[in-house]
Amino acid sequence: MEDRILTHCPHCQASNRLPADRIADAPVCGRCGEPLLAGQPLELSDANFDAVATASVQPLLVDFWAPWCGPCRMMAPAFEQAGKTLAGRALLAKVNSDDNPQLSARFGIRSIPTLVRIAKGHETARQSGALPASAIVALAGV
């Protein structure tokens, strides 16, 4: 079975299932036809992470977080704002470290929130702790 990512259209809020390995193909909403990745962070998992990381031609900035983490919740709006600023230049994604322990272990996540930048399939930068949108944009390196 093909790995898929569930995302919501920022224009009409329709749910869309995207093949993870086609994320770089500028997907559009099945309902309204507008671009789906207009700065919206993707929700990634143990199952679909590798397909997205290898398919992305843009840098991938991943936020490892947990729902119970106060600083993670505090940084969430800044991460979304950075996503809008970086639209078309970088792909932003979130990984719930509680739901995806294998991925968190693979990246050696010891504290959250932790942002990891991946380019061409390799980690190129890492920063732990809550950051403002301007610092998140700078970490993306584009």
Go through the PLM ranges and name each one:
Residues 111, 116-142:
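Non-catalytic, surface beta->alpha helical segment in thiol-disulfide oxidoreductase systems
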Residues 13-16, 36, 76:
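Cys/His-rich microdomains that often coordinate metals
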Residues 41-60:
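A short beta-strand-turn-helix
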Residues 7, 27, 67:
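Cys/His-enriched microdomains
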